[in-house]
Swiss-Prot record:
Residue ranges of domain EngA-type G in the record: 3-166, 211-384
Start and end residues of each KH-like domain: 385-469
Residue segments, region Disordered: 468-500
PANTHER family: GTPASE DER
Gene Ontology biological process terms in this record: ribosome biogenesis
Name assigned to this protein: GTPase Der
Function: GTPase that plays an essential role in the late steps of ribosome biogenesis.
Biased composition (Basic residues): 486-500
Gene3D superfamilies linked to this entry: 3.30.300.20, P-loop containing nucleotide triphosphate hydrolases
Keywords: GTP-binding, Nucleotide-binding, Repeat, Ribosome biogenesis
Pfam families linked: KH_dom-like, MMR_HSR1
Binding, GTP 2: 217-224, 264-268, 329-332
MF (Gene Ontology): GTP binding; ribosome binding
Organism this protein belongs to: Aliivibrio fischeri (strain ATCC 700601 / ES114) (Vibrio fischeri)
Gene this protein is translated from: der
Length: 500
C-alpha cells in the first residue's frame, strides 16, 4: 500500500511550505481542469520511484485545555492512520507550550515520528535546535523547507522502510544526535521521460487482473448502502480480508464472468452488523483506496448541494489518474422540479469532468445500480485500451492540420510523433521541437482531440511532452570537411565573377 506521511505542528512552522514543495505539479497534463478546486490539505508526492500521500493536519494549538480537546477530529485521525509523522517546529521562534503539548500526544502513540526543526537557514542551527531536546524525541532533524535544503534527505530517512533500497549509511544516525540534513545536497528530479517499453510493461501488468473498484464519498451519502446492495445482488459471502485497522477491506466478487475487487472504505462487514446511522469517514482510508483502484465510483447525495469535499475527493481521483463513474444517490422520491435543479447544478459544477458517466440511483431500493457496472467496464476498457504509435501519430498530425500549434519566440512549434507511455490512465507521449513551451490551451485541445478520436470515455488522459534533441546542437556551428570544400569553391567562384 502507498505510505501516508502526516505533517504535524502548530501554525506557522512551515507545514504549508513543505507541503507545497513536495506536492508540486508536473509537466504532464494531469489535472488541468478549469473549475477544479485544489485541496490544500492532502496531495500526492513522489521520491524517486516511491509515491506517497501527504497530509497537512492543519495548525494545532494545545495551549489552553490540552491537545486532545484542541486538535480537530480529522487531525487526530490523520495522526492515528498515518505511517510516518513529521513533527515540525520553528527553529527561529523556539520551543513553545503548544510544541510541548503536541509532543506529549505523539509520544503516547507508537508511531514513527521525526522531529523536524525548520527555518534554520542563516542562523546557528545547532544552538536553535538545542532546546527541542526537551520534547523527548531522541532525534532532531534540521531542514530549510523554503529553500528545499535537507528535504530530500529527510524523506529518504522517513520512507526508508517503504523503499526498495536502503538509505545510504552516511545518512543514518544513532539516538541522541542532531542530524543537519541541509548539509546534504538536495535536488529536484525532472519527470521521467516515458518510453514505449514503459507502456508495454504497464499494459502487461494490467492483463488478467480483476477490476479494482473503490466506492468513495463524503459521510452519509450512502456508500455503505450501495456496497451492501452490490454485494447482496451478487450473493457473495462477505468476509474480512487480512489487514490492519487503518486499511480498507478488499472484497472479491464476480458479475457476468468479470472479476472485481471491491475496495470498501466505509467499514462495511456482514450485513447483520450494519447498524450505525453515521459512517466513520476517513480521508486517509479513502485516498489509499483511490491510489490502489482502477476505477473510482464517486457517490454524491442528490438531496444536498455539491460540496467542496465532493470536489476535493473528485480532484484527488483525477490527479491519481483513475477512471471515474459518478453515482447521484437518493434520487427516488424527488420532485421533477428538484431533479431538474440537481441536474443543472451538476452541469455547472462538474462540467470539467464531462468524460465521466453520471448515474442517478437509489442504493436503498436498487434503482439504477445494475447500470453502474456497464460504465465501470467502459471506463476500465478505455483506460487500458492498447493503441499503437502509428495511430497516435496519425491522430496528432490530424489535430495539427485542424489547428496549427502557436508560435513560440517567433518559431512554430513542431509536433513530430506520438507513442503510448502508459495505461490506467492512458498516457500519450508527444515528441517535437519546443513542445514543452506549448500553452495550456493547446495542450487541452490535443487532449480533447485524442479523447474524441479514440472514443475514450470514463477516464482522464495524460499527455507528456518531450523535446526532441537537435543532432547539430553540440557542433558549435562548425562545417564538415565536405561543407568547407564547397564553401571555398563558392567563394572562389564569387571572386572570379567579381574580377570579370
Amino acid at each position: 500500500m502507498i505510505p501516508v506521511v502526516a505533517l504535524v505542528g502548530r501554525p506557522n512552522v512551515g507545514k504549508s511550505t513543505l507541503f507545497n514543495r513536495l506536492t508540486r505539479t508536473r509537466d504532464a497534463l494531469v489535472a488541468d481542469f478549469p473549475g477544479l478546486t485544489r485541496d490544500r490539505k492532502y496531495g500526492r508526492a513522489k521520491l524517486e520511484e516511491q509515491e506517497f500521500i501527504l497530509i497537512d493536519t492543519g495548525g494545532i494549538d494545545g495551549t489552553e485545555q490540552g491537545v486532545e480537546t484542541k486538535m480537530a477530529e480529522q487531525s487526530l485521525a490523520a495522526i492515528e492512520e498515518a505511517d510516518v509523522v513529521l513533527f515540525m517546529v520553528d527553529g527561529r521562534a523556539g520551543l513553545t507550550s503548544a510544541d510541548e503539548a503536541i509532543a506529549k500526544h505523539l509520544r503516547s502513540r507508537e508511531k514513527p515520528t521525526f522531529l523536524v526543526v525548520n527555518k534554520i537557514d542563516g542562523i546557528d542551527a545547532d544552538a536553535a535546535s538545542a532546546e527541542f531536546w526537551q520534547l523527548g524525541m531522541n532525534k532532531v532533524y534540521q531542514i530549510a523547507a523554503s529553500h528545499g535544503r535537507g528535504v530530500t534527505s529527510l524523506l529518504e530517512l522517513a520512507l526508508a522502510p517503504f523503499m526498495e533500497e536502503l538509505v545510504e549509511e552516511s545518512l543514518k544516525d544513532e539516538n541522541g544526535e542532531i542530524t543537519d540534513l541541509t548539509e546534504f545536497e538536495d535536488f529536484e528530479d525532472e519527470e521521467k521521460d516515458l518510453t514505449e517499453e514503459d507502456a508495454e510493461k504497464d499494459f502487461a501488468r494490467l492483463q488478467d487482473q480483476p477490476i479494482k473498484l473503490a466506492i468513495i464519498g463524503r459521510p452519509n451519502v450512502g456508500k455503505s448502502t450501495l456496497t451492501n446492495r452490490i454485494l447482496g445482488e451478487e450473493r457473495v459471502v462477505v468476509y474480512d480480508m487480512p489487514g490492519t485497522t487503518r486499511d480498507s477491506i478488499y472484497i472479491p466478487m464476480e458479475r457476468e464472468g468479470q472479476e472485481y475487487v471491491l475496495i470498501d472504505t466505509a467499514g462495511v462487514r456482514r450485513r447483520g452488523r450494519i447498524n450505525e446511522t453515521v459512517e466513520k469517514f476517513s480521508v486517509i482510508k479513502t485516498l489509499k483506496a483511490v491510489e490502489d483502484a482502477n476505477v473510482v465510483l464517486l457517490v454524491i447525495d442528490a438531496r444536498e448541494n455539491i460540496s467542496d469535499q465532493d470536489l476535493s475527493l473528485l480532484g484527488f481521483a483525477l490527479n491519481a489518474g483513475r477512471s471515474l463513474v459518478i453515482a447521484v444517490n437518493k434520487w427516488d422520491g424527488l420532485d421533477n422540479d428538484v431533479k431538474e435543479k440537481v441536474k443543472s447544478e451538476l452541469d455547472r459544477r462538474l462540467g470539467f469532468v464531462d468524460f465521466a458517466r453520471i448515474h442517478f440511483i437509489s442504493a436503498l431500493h436498487g434503482t439504477g445500480v445494475g447500470h453502474l457496472y456497464e460504465s465501470v467496464q467502459e471506463a476500465y476498457v478505455s483506460a487500458t485500451k492498447r493503441v499503437g504509435t502509428s495511430v497516435l501519430t496519425r491522430i496528432m498530425k490530424m489535430a495539427q492540420d485542424d489547428h496549427q500549434p502557436p508560435l513560440v519566440r517567433g518559431r512554430r512549434v513542431k509536433l513530430k510523433y506520438a507513442h503510448a507511455g502508459g495505461y490506467n490512465p492512458p498516457l500519450i507521449v508527444i515528441h517535437g521541437n519546443q513542445v514543452k513551451e506549448l500553452p495550456s490551451s493547446y495542450k487541452r485541445f490535443l487532449m480533447n482531440y485524442y479523447r474524441k478520436s479514440l472514443e475514450i470515455m470514463g477516464t482522464p488522459i495524460r499527455i507528456q511532452f518531450q523535446n526532441s534533441e537537435n543532432p547539430f546542437e553540440d557542433r558549435g556551428g562548425k562545417l564538415t570537411m565536405s561543407q568547407e570544400r564547397q564553401r571555398k569553391r563558392l567563394l572562389g567562384a564569387v571572386k572570379n565573377r567579381n574580377k570579370k
